[in-house]
Amino acid sequence: MANRLNNDFQFIDVGRQDPEKKPARTRAKQFAEIYEPYKPQDAAAQAHRCLHCGNPYCEWKCPVHNYIPNWLQLVSEGNILEAAELSHRTNSLPEVCGRVCPQDRLCEGDCTLNDGFGAVTIGSVEKYITDTAFAMGWRPDMSKVTWTDKKVAIIGAGPAGLGCADILVRNGVKPVVFDKYPEIGGLLTFGIPEFKLEKTVMERRRAVFEEMGVEFCLGVEIGRDMPFEQLLEEYDAVFLGMGTYKYMEGGFPGEDLPGVHKALDYLVANVNHCLGFETDPADYVSLEGQRVVVLGGGDTAMDCNRTAIRQGAASVTCAYRRDEDNMPGSRKEVANAREEGVDFLFNRQPVAVIGEDRVEGIKVVRTRLGEPDENGRQRPEVVPGSEEVVPADAVVIAFGFQPSPAPWFETVGIELDEKGRVKAPEEGAYAFQTTNEKIFAGGDMVRGSDLVVTAVFEGRQAGEGILDYLDV
């Protein structure tokens, strides 16, 4: 270790090395995480590649602004428990973000070593820190918390709700988290497949939160099993972290044919099936032996592609309307999908699902990239006369999600914007306070469908806003 720690050129002598990955042929048959854990010496060597830049771009690109160079140094020195403590100062779910964040678009994408040497494996080290610390018996230190008589109801046990609960409980405010699902995590548990995030990770995190003092009321849907007004009466404040679940339609003919599936319904039903939760057997969709076309280019589309592979689909093709460089998801996930047998059709825009009584194919047109849109991405333009039909037995549509406001929002004075998102500005009198002063909100239902880590950040910031509101 001494020789390594004194080596200022570790980033040259030791190249970027990701954790060992299971062979594609093996993992394509398993709903299990595909990366092996880092060995301690490998994690330390990779962490020591960090240059400790005076202006750490990785830290600024991270939505929760993790103290990345600092905990990399602690790992390189073997100080895992200190690294875990530091990691949890900014992130409520570091072991989750280490697994599911698109680091190539965030921290690792801005690493100085990208130019010629390969970025530090920040995400893998982040995962290693918390997994190892928990295995060593580490738990968040709650010994200095002074408990108040305040309690806050949180609707949604996804990343935003858990981030909010984390901030509140560490400051002596009792969080009670309600969720319609039987386990915590929201789409972390019921949407993201186990080859990216094994569900034991969230089970462990639930136990940790409960030890800290967070109370969970699971299998309870507010508005169905309990009136929202009851929460307003019984709690000092309420946080909404209900996510975005509404399917974005393609708007083309044939979308209602048998054999066309909504991405989220498909993924949730598969997770329920794998975990053995009691649901309507008709909800589960097996694509075994079928020619599958997945429409979309984000991480949800990759989850659908790779799930279909594991179900034994005859073939899986992902069709996306822009080129590969413009895909919105993680490049790592695209590479994993390709290794596992997914084919890609780029610059293809769907115009109709073909079939009489069920899906027989998907009609697409070729596109070329034109002028940038309002987000700076080149718009796909249709190439005239380029229609073709891709044969298919099943089509999965993964175009993203929209907010689905609850019927009681208007009743309690929660205002929405033109896209159906809850108005809860970060820069308001209290961070993420809605138009009802007692109600706060954050995550996808405020910003629109986005990353896990941004939801964690907004939940934590809303927690700080609630503390200010309660004068704690």
Curated annotation (Swiss-Prot):
One of its GO terms (molecular function) is 4 iron, 4 sulfur cluster binding. Residues 41-72 form the 4Fe-4S ferredoxin-type domain. Its cofactor is [4Fe-4S] cluster. [4Fe-4S] cluster binds at C50, C53, C58, C62. It comes from the Bacteria. Binds 1 [4Fe-4S] cluster. It catalyses: 2 L-glutamate + NADP(+) = L-glutamine + 2-oxoglutarate + NADPH + H(+). Induction: Up-regulated at high salt concentration. GO terms for biological process: L-glutamate biosynthetic process. It is an enzyme of class 1 (oxidoreductase). The keyword Transit peptide does not apply. Pathway: Amino-acid biosynthesis; L-glutamate biosynthesis via GLT pathway; L-glutamate from 2-oxoglutarate and L-glutamine (NADP(+) route): step 1/1; Energy metabolism; nitrogen metabolism. Catalyzes the conversion of L-glutamine and 2-oxoglutarate into two molecules of L-glutamate. This is Glutamate synthase [NADPH] small chain. It comes from Halomonas elongata (strain ATCC 33173 / DSM 2581 / NBRC 15536 / NCIMB 2198 / 1H9).
